[in-house]
């Protein structure tokens, strides 16, 4: 197992970074690049049994500068400031998250894409802030895509519109058809969506968290949908305005091109 910091007694020395961990991380990032896959690097998350989510602010700032210095040279890297940042607000209040964006932007000479992911659907970050390049939301209600586009004026990704799978959690047991339907709504409303699978596995290997082999039925359908989108205008499409029928029926277009 690799850990980002060196051990110090029973705990960690947050001022000393484990070189082997970051060499391994760089290897994996490079492998994704070789496959033509964008690497959205999650910098913080609340699901932590090592104490990393509760570092002091100055330790957080130093860590960010170090990670950006190591990974910014990879052209396919994006920065996700956090997975479900709002679950860490007790230890990292909003002004700290704002400063995190500033640090990443100031230390990345290549100005990679930057965003942040909410947990509670009512806790979207203020994506109008200048350090945010695109909007990331977690929300099952993909029909709000037009609302988010209008509110933030930036590209929108619903990167957790729930998962195809069969686990007990309600966010991880929608059907393949439902996930593809949500993708369709996101795309025709002028946005993007994230894909994942959460099928039970005898060795508890969920693709959602550990990768591996996709076993579901949504990914080939999404491949077909991608083909439809790529056959359309290179500039993309704009969602149709108005509440009826386009509040209930996803539709968009550009010029004489229509998707409904």
What are these regions, as identified by a protein language model?
Residues 1-144:
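Active-site mouth of glycoside hydrolases
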Residues 31, 148, 185:
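Hydrophobic/aromatic ligand-binding patch that stacks against planar heteroaromatic rings
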Residues 34-36, 153, 190:
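Glycine-centered short loops/turns at secondary-structure junctions
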Residues 39-40, 156, 193-194:
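Hydrophobic beta-strand scaffold residues
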Residues 47-52, 83-87, 112, 118-127, ...:
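Active-site clefts of carbohydrate-active enzymes
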Residues 57, 90, 169-173, 215:
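Hydrophobic alpha-helical scaffolding
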Residues 69, 106, 149-150, 188:
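Solvent-exposed polar/charged
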Residues 165-166, 179-260:
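Aromatic- and carboxylate-lined catalytic core of secreted/periplasmic carbohydrate-active enzymes
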